[in-house]
């Protein structure tokens, strides 16, 4: 499972906060995590990148060529917890997305907590099973609680573990309704997120969304053993899990960006001299959980 999540988190900026004088501290630290972006994909598609994205990170950033998780059975929940806490499951408690509770002999979800209600969702989520401090928590301590921390992701576990225990909010897309969701654990749902749900959420636009190849067929040669079939997907069928399929398409990354812009423009993120954290998770996995051979063209576009 090496390379399940490729982390591009810029944590080195944060670790030097206490050693710097306040005026030199960054106003905003942005954490970028890309779910299922494998290292071989990152290299295979390199000729398609623009100069201000991955190429800039490769040239100007710190690249760790042999990084890997030091535990087995890596999935999204355990990987996110490891990335943001800097610890392994034996320490942070998040061994998987789901596991068997030894006390009840029932399966439990890594983010389940019935003590907290959901906003725009019936999920009851909180980071209470995460046993260690996170980057977000340490930022809150360093700024005496004044730094703003928001985490935005397609999935609940990715948002919750990135926001940590002390974050101001964690937001993920409800796979049933398409609305951005949250939990009462972090307090009130921000007005700007509610406004986005009411006016611009994907549920009001999804019937007009169509996904077709970005490039001519001849440019889809980067993955071996791919099926040469041009695809076309629409998301207007309520009977076919349209929001769940949408979340595994590249369009979900546009939604993450859109809510991030709302957080910056209306949520006061990065607006003062106190360092804030905006943790964003994107999706680069297989569409509708198909095999690589079935959706190689889709993976390249994503």
Question: What residue ranges belong to the model's regions?
Answer:
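Generic, well-ordered alpha-helical scaffold segments in large soluble proteins
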Residues: 3, 7, 40, 60, ...
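Short, structured active-site-proximal loop/turn typified by the sulfatase FGly-forming signature C/S-X-P-X-R
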Residues: 42-91, 148-152
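Stable alpha-helical elements in mature extracytoplasmic
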Residues: 33, 37-41, 50-54, 76-80, ...
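Short secondary-structure boundary/capping segments
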Residues: 45-49, 164-176, 292-300
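Bacterial Sec-dependent N-terminal signal peptides
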Residues: 1-24
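Beta-strand elements within well-structured catalytic alpha/beta cores of enzymes
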Residues: 26-38, 57, 83, 139, ...
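Second-shell loop/turn segments in exported
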Residues: 38-44, 69, 121-127, 243-250, ...
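His/Asp/Glu-rich, glycine-adjacent segments
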Residues: 87-88, 93-274, 283-288
């Amino acid at each position: 499972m090496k390379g399940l999540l490729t982390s591009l988190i810029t944590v080195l900026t944060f670790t030097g906060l206490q050693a710097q004088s306040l005026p030199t501290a960054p106003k905003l630290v942005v954490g970028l995590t890309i779910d299922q972006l494998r290292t071989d994909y990152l290299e295979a598609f390199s000729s398609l990148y623009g100069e201000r994205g991955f190429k800039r990170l490769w040239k100007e950033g710190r690249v760790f060529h042999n990084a890997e998780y030091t535990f087995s059975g890596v999935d999204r929940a355990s990987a996110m917890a490891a990335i943001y806490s800097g610890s392994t499951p034996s320490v942070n408690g998040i061994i998987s997305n789901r596991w068997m509770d030894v006390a009840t002999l029932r399966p439990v979800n890594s983010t389940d907590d019935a003590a907290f209600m959901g906003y725009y969702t019936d999920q009851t989520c909180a980071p209470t099973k995460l046993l260690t401090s996170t980057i977000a928590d340490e930022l809150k301590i360093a700024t005496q609680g004044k730094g703003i921390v928001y985490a935005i992701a397609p999935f609940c576990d990715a948002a919750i573990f990135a926001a940590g225990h002390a974050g101001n909010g964690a937001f993920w897309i409800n796979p049933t309704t398409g609305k951005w969701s949250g939990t009462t654990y972090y307090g009130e749902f921000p007005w700007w997120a509610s406004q986005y749900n009411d006016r611009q959420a994907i549920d009001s636009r999804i019937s007009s969304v169509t996904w077709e190849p970005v490039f001519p067929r001849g440019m889809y040669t980067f993955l071996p053993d791919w099926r040469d079939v041009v695809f076309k997907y629409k998301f207007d069928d309520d009977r076919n899990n349209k929001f769940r399929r949408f979340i595994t398409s590249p369009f979900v990354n546009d939604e993450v960006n859109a809510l991030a812009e709302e957080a910056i423009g209306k949520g006061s993120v990065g607006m003062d001299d106190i360092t804030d954290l905006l943790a964003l998770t994107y999706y680069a996995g297989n569409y509708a959980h198909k095999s690589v051979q079935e959706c190689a063209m889709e993976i390249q576009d994503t």
